[in-house]
C-alpha cells in the first residue's frame, strides 16, 4: 500500500477549541459529542483570550524534536522522492538546529503579538495568496498554496510539520487528506465564537489518546489525539498529481520547483518500485505522544531527599524490571527519591507517599521476597494466631516470634493509656475482630466462644455457598475498639472474589511500613488466600495489595539501599497439606516452601 503524503512528510494539525453556545445549553435534553468543542476564534482573537496551560502544551508539542529519529525520517522522505539527499533551500533561512515546521494562514500570523514573531525555535511558514517575502522583516517562508508546502518540505531538514490554523487552512489540509494526526485541546467552557474548526470525519479520524484533565484560567481542559484511520482514502495522487479528475493541487509550471513536482509525479507512476516499510513508525509516534502528554510534569527533583541515584547503581542499570518483586522495590525507590518528609507517631520520621497497588499471581508463584531473607516461620505463626482469634502476645513469644513484642511492653501500653492491661495483652486486635467482631473485650484470658460475629466463618460460608457475592469481606477496623487495641490494625480490610474455580484476595492497608511490615503482609495474605482456597476446594488466583500511607522510616534508608541493589531470584512455591479441610486445623507443619532462593538477611530496627 502506498505511503500517504502526510505520512511521508509527517504533517500534523494542532488546535484548541472551546464549546460554543447552544440553544439547549444547560437544559436536560442537551446533547454532547466530539463536535461540541469547535470554537476557534472570535473577532480575530482567541475566544478565551488566553489559556496558559494550553499555550504551554502548544509550545511543548511544536518545539519538541528527537534528533535520534531524524535520520530515519530523512531517509523515508528521500526514498519517497527518489533522491539521495534533501536539497537545502539556500535563499531561505534554514537553522542548523533541527526544528519543527509550523504552518499558518495570514490571519493567524497577524494575531500573534509582535514580540513573539516569528514563533521561536520553529520554522515559520505562512500560507497566503497575497503576501510576498518582501512584506516581512522576520525570517519566514511564504507559500501561496498547499502544494507549495509539499515542495518546500521536500527541501527542508525538519522533524515534523504542524498546521496551526486558522479555520480555512485546517479545512483545506483536511479535505486534501494531508493531516496525519490532530492534536486537539478541549477547552471546557463556552465562549462567543465566529470561527470554527471543521467537523472531523469520524470515518477518517479516530481518537487514539486522551490526556489527564487540568484546570487553567478558570476552566477545565484536556488534550486528545485524533489519528488518520487505515480506511482506504482518496489516493494522494488526487492531492498532488494534478490529474484532470482532481485539480486541487496542480503542478507548478512557472518556476524552479517544477522539476521537484515532476519528481513527485514520477514517483506515483512507479510507486511499487519505491515502496518503503516502516514497521516502527507507530512506536516512534507513541514515544513522541507520550512526551507530549507529559508536558506538564515537573522535572524530577534531583536529590530531593538528599539521596542520590548513584546509591542505586545496580537498580538503575536494569533496562526492564518485570519481576513481580519490583512492584515492591519500585515503590521503595519512588518514596526514597520523591517521598514527602514527615514526622510520625514513633518519633523516628519517615519519607512517605499515598496510594500504590501491587498484584501477585498466586497461580504461578508464592511472593516471598527474595532480595532479603524473610522470617517465614514467624509470618505463618502470626497468621495462625490471628485465625485462632488470639490476643495473647506471650503465645508468639513462647515460639520465639517477636513481631508483637515491642507493642506489648508496659511502656508501650501505658503510652496508649492502657494502664490496666497486663503486659503482652494486646487487646481486641486482628484475630479478635476476625472471630468475635462486636463482642466486649475484657482480657486475653477470657473465653469469647460464640460471642460477636465470626467474620472468618462467614466469609468461608459465602465462598462455598454464594461465591458470586460481593459481600465476602473481612474487616479488622472496629472503630469502637480502636482505643482498646495495643496497635490499631494496619491491614484493615480484605475482600475475596471467586471465578472459574479460583479465589482472589484484595487487601487494603492503611499504614504501610515498607521496610519491615509490607514484606510480611504480602506473604501473610498470600498464604491466607491459599488456605481459604484449599478449604473451599478452589485454586488460588491473585493477591492484590492496595497501599494507603506508604512510608520508609529514616532508620531503614541505608538498609533499603542495599536491598534495592540486589537482583531478585525466582519466587518459591507454597505447598499446603492437602488433607486439611478446616481453616482452624492448620499447624506450622502443614506448610512447605519449595525452592526459596534468597539474598542474606537485612536487619532493620522496628519503630514502635
UniProtKB/Swiss-Prot annotation:
CDD domains: DHFR (cd00209), TS_Pyrimidine_HMase (cd00351)
Domain of life, per lineage: Eukaryota
GO biological process terms held by the UniProt record: dTMP biosynthetic process; methylation; one-carbon metabolic process; tetrahydrofolate biosynthetic process
Region (Thymidylate synthase): 322-608
Binding site for dUMP: 345, 491, 509-513, 521, 551-553
Residue sites binding substrate per the record: 14-15, 31, 54, 108, 164, 170, 185
Gene Ontology molecular function, alphabetical: dihydrofolate reductase activity; thymidylate synthase activity
Keyword Oxidoreductase on entry: yes
Pathway field: Cofactor biosynthesis; tetrahydrofolate biosynthesis; 5,6,7,8-tetrahydrofolate from 7,8-dihydrofolate: step 1/1
EC nos: 1.5.1.3, 2.1.1.45
A single GO cellular-component term on record: cytosol
Start and end residues of each DHFR domain: 10-228
NCBIfam families documented for this protein: PRK01827.1-3, thym_sym
Similarity comment text for this entry: In the N-terminal section; belongs to the dihydrofolate reductase family.
Note: K1 is from a pyrimethamine-resistant strain; FCR3 is a pyrimethamine-sensitive strain.
Function: Bifunctional enzyme. Involved in de novo dTMP biosynthesis. Key enzyme in folate metabolism. Catalyzes an essential reaction for de novo glycine and purine synthesis, DNA precursor synthesis, and for the conversion of dUMP to dTMP.
Protein name: Bifunctional dihydrofolate reductase-thymidylate synthase
Organism: Plasmodium falciparum (isolate K1 / Thailand)
Amino acid at each position: 500500500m502506498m505511503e500517504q503524503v502526510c505520512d511521508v512528510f509527517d504533517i500534523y494539525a494542532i488546535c484548541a477549541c472551546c464549546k460554543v453556545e447552544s440553544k439547549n445549553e444547560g437544559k436536560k435534553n442537551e446533547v454532547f459529542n466530539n463536535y461540541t468543542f469547535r470554537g476557534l476564534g472570535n473577532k480575530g482573537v482567541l475566544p478565551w483570550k488566553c489559556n496558559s496551560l494550553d499555550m504551554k502544551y502548544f509550545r511543548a508539542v511544536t518545539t519538541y524534536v528527537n534528533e535520534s529519529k531524524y535520520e530515519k525520517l530523512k531517509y523515508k522522505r528521500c526514498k519517497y522522492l527518489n533522491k539521495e539527499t534533501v536539497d537545502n533551500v539556500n535563499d531561505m533561512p534554514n537553522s542548523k538546529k533541527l526544528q519543527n515546521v509550523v504552518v499558518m494562514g495570514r490571519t493567524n500570523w497577524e494575531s500573534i503579538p509582535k514580540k513573539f514573531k516569528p514563533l521561536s525555535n520553529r520554522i515559520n511558514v505562512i500560507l497566503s495568496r497575497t503576501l510576498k517575502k518582501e512584506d516581512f522583516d522576520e525570517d519566514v517562508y511564504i507559500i501561496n498554496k498547499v502544494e507549495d508546502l509539499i515542495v518546500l518540505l521536500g527541501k527542508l531538514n525538519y522533524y515534523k510539520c504542524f498546521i496551526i490554523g486558522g479555520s480555512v487552512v485546517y479545512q483545506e489540509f483536511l479535505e486534501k487528506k494531508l493531516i496525519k494526526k490532530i492534536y486537539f485541546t478541549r477547552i471546557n467552557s463556552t465562549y462567543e465564537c465566529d470561527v470554527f474548526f471543521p467537523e472531523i470525519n469520524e470515518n477518517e479520524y479516530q481518537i487514539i489518546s486522551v490526556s489527564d484533565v487540568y484546570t487553567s484560567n478558570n476552566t477545565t481542559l484536556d488534550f486528545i489525539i485524533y489519528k488518520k484511520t487505515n480506511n482506504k482514502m482518496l489516493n494522494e495522487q488526487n492531492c498532488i498529481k494534478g490529474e484532470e479528475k482532481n485539480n486541487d493541487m496542480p503542478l507548478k509550471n512557472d518556476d524552479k520547483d517544477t522539476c521537484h513536482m515532476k519528481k513527485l509525479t514520477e514517483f506515483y507512476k512507479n510507486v511499487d518500485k519505491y515502496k518503503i516499510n516502516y514497521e516502527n513508525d507507530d512506536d516512534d509516534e507513541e514515544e513522541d505522544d507520550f512526551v507530549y502528554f507529559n508536558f506538564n510534569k515537573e522535572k524530577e527533583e534531583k536529590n530531593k531527599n538528599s539521596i542520590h541515584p548513584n546509591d542505586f547503581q545496580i537498580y538503575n542499570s536494569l533496562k526492564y524490571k518485570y519481576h513481580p518483586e519490583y512492584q515492591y522495590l519500585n515503590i521503595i525507590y519512588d518514596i526514597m527519591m520523591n517521598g514527602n518528609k514527615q514526622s510520625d507517631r514513633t518519633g523516628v520520621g519517615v519519607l512517605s507517599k499515598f496510594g500504590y497497588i501491587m498484584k501477585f499471581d498466586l497461580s504461578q508463584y508464592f511472593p516471598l521476597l527474595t532480595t532479603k531473607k524473610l522470617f517465614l516461620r514467624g509470618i505463618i505463626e502470626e497468621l495462625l494466631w490471628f485465625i485462632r482469634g488470639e490476643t495473647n502476645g506471650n503465645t508468639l513469644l513462647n515460639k520465639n516470634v517477636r513481631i508483637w513484642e515491642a507493642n506489648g511492653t508496659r511502656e508501650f501500653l501505658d503510652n496508649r493509656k492502657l494502664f490496666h492491661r497486663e503486659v503482652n495483652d494486646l487487646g481486641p486486635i486482628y484475630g479478635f475482630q476476625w472471630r468475635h467482631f462486636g463482642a466486649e473485650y475484657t482480657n486475653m484470658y477470657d473465653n469469647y466462644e460464640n460471642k460477636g460475629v465470626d467474620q472468618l466463618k462467614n466469609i468461608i460460608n459465602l465462598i462455598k455457598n454464594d461465591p458470586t457475592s460481593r459481600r465476602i469481606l473481612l474487616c479488622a477496623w472496629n472503630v469502637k475498639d480502636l482505643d482498646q487495641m495495643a496497635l490499631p490494625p494496619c491491614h484493615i480490610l480484605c475482600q475475596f472474589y471467586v471465578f472459574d474455580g479460583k479465589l482472589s484476595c484484595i487487601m487494603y492497608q492503611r499504614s504501610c511500613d515498607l521496610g519491615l511490615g509490607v514484606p510480611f503482609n504480602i506473604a501473610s495474605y498470600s498464604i491466607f488466600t491459599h488456605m481459604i482456597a484449599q478449604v473451599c476446594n478452589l485454586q488460588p488466583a491473585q493477591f492484590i495489595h492496595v497501599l494507603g500511607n506508604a512510608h520508609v522510616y529514616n532508620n531503614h534508608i541505608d538498609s533499603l539501599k542495599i536491598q534495592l541493589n540486589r537482583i531478585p531470584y525466582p519466587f518459591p512455591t507454597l505447598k499446603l497439606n492437602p488433607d486439611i479441610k478446616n481453616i482452624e486445623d492448620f499447624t506450622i507443619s502443614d506448610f512447605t516452601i519449595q525452592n526459596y532462593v534468597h539474598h542474606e538477611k537485612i536487619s532493620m530496627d522496628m519503630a514502635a
